[in-house]
């Protein structure tokens, strides 16, 4: 029997209608896996050995009672076959420390989804620089004068921090906007932090597409997140509306170009953000949108994921 651990935010607070981690647990349970639940505070390191307090778990699609803890134990993480790291950002120093603990288990043979080193290496915004032929025009800088020159060149730009999620602190600065200076100062904290500028993509009106990639293979359907009227952010957390769709030709092209690199880096479950035919982000920490896509199309994304995990476990 496969023992699957999951590190996540408190399961008591999730919305099971939309939660991708919950969907993964349902599929793992359906396959007869033993489920071990952990929060960040359960992980620890003693003399180089990664351990945790885990609670064995059963889950069900029931809005009144969706989980039950069936036991509690303290065990070496190496006792688990696979661990899903599903803690939501912020990607802060605490998150980084947890990846070192998970990496000690990985060294003992546990499969970690996604690979701890790659979680540290691949910032969701900056990792797109490795695929710059697919992205909008992009500037990463602390320098206000460079941001101003970029804005003057493109006249309509998006500014964002490198560590936001859910559309937080994303600004659109149009031609003639008097606020560029103060936005640049705010995002760079007066030149002490990097921020990202990209030319505005009018295709955002048709949605910001979340394309999921499972161990290098694109899922054939995506979720287009369509901004509310007058809004430039499609994120569901920012009030956008989700619309599942089949991938377009350019979506396939982008996902197939990036897929092999993701697979090689042990990034087994990844969410690409695509606007029009441009790649804007590569989400590696805790990608979502499984449930919305599965509700609309005949595809089991969690099935693809568990198949990929089983294939990797057999190779070990």
Curated annotation (Swiss-Prot):
It catalyses: gamma-L-glutamyl-L-cysteine + glycine + ATP = glutathione + ADP + phosphate + H(+). Pathway: Sulfur metabolism; glutathione biosynthesis; glutathione from L-cysteine and L-glutamate: step 2/2. InterPro entries: ATP-grasp (IPR011761), ATP_grasp_subdomain_1 (IPR013815), Glut_synth_pro (IPR006284), GSHS_ATP-bd (IPR004218), GSHS_N (IPR004215), PreATP-grasp_dom_sf (IPR016185). Keywords: ATP-binding, Glutathione biosynthesis, Ligase, Magnesium, Manganese, Metal-binding, Nucleotide-binding. The gene is gshB. This is Glutathione synthetase. SUPFAM superfamilies: Glutathione synthetase ATP-binding domain-like, PreATP-grasp domain. Residues 125-310 form the ATP-grasp domain. GO terms for molecular function: ATP binding; glutathione synthase activity; metal ion binding. It comes from the Bacteria. GO terms for cellular component: cytoplasm.
């Amino acid at each position: 029997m496969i023992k699957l651990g999951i590190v996540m935010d408190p399961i008591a607070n999730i919305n099971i209608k939309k939660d991708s981690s919950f969907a993964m647990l349902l599929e793992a349970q359906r396959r007869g896996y033993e489920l071990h639940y952990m929060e960040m505070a359960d992980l620890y390191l003693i003399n180089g050995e990664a351990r945790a307090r885990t609670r064995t778990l059963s889950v069900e699609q029931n809005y009144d009672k969706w989980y039950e803890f069936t036991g509690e134990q303290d065990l070496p993480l190496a006792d688990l076959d696979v661990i899903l790291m599903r803690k939501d950002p912020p990607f802060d120093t605490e998150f980084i420390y947890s990846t070192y603990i998970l990496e000690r288990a990985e060294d003992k043979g546990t499969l970690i989804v996604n690979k701890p080193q790659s979680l540290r290496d691949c910032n969701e915004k900056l990792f797109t620089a490795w695929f710059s032929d697919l992205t909008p025009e992009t500037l990463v800088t602390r320098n206000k004068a460079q941001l101003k020159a970029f804005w003057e060149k493109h006249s309509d730009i998006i500014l964002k921090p490198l560590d936001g999620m859910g559309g937080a602190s994303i600004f659109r600065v149009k031609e003639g906007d008097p606020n560029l200076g103060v936005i640049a100062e705010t995002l760079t904290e007066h030149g002490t932090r990097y921020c990202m500028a990209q030319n505005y993509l009018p295709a955002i009106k048709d949605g910001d597409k979340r394309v999921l990639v499972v161990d290098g293979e694109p899922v054939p359907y995506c979720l287009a997140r369509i901004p509310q009227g007058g809004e430039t952010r499609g994120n569901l957390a920012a009030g956008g509306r989700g619309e599942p769709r089949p991938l377009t030709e350019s979506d396939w092209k982008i996902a197939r170009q990036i897929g092999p690199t993701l697979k090689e880096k042990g990034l087994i479950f990844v969410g690409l953000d695509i606007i029009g035919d441009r790649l804007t982000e590569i989400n590696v920490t805790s990608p979502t949108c499984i449930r919305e896509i599965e509700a609309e199309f005949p595809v089991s994304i969690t099935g693809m994921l568990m198949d990929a995990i089983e294939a990797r476990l057999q190779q070990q």
